Amino acid sequence: KDGRIWVSEGVNYRRHYDRKPEGDRIMVLEDTDGDGQADKEWAFVQEPFLRCPMGVAVIDNKVVVSMTPDMIVYTDVNRDLVFDPEVDKREVLLSGFNGRVHDHSLHSVTVGPDGQWYWNAGNCGAVFTDRSARTFRIGSSYMTQEAAGKASDDGHVYVGGFTARMNPDGSWVN
């Protein structure tokens, strides 16, 4: 609708973890003249700790970045489409996803018709606590076994990849 696409850059992927010491970027590409080609681009954010983010979702003035072990929410307070740590906010919404710079781990978020955020993670496993203080233990036959066979606070035992939904504030994951 606005001619923009947001892209997560993954130059620092696995073997190349330190290829770009200044960190990877979340880029904005814009088609300003409606010809279907991006003619303007800029970095929304680039930080040294950004290493191969696997997903980016733009929800109003929030930019949700999926990068293990965290789901990070950048709030563009002044809506200028550039993250400024002096003005804007950065918050780790959820943390505990396994698989550093790994494509089998945490991926992008999307908003459902019910207003909840839907997201998925691959088979690397996870142990995370949502904002309603419930801990989820996702076992993995692929990586670490720390959560294997252990029930989550909702009573279920999870193994492998999973899909979840939650309130936008990170509460009530299910």
Located regions from the model:
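Beta-propeller domains with acidic blade repeats across secreted/periplasmic ectodomains
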Residues: 1-174
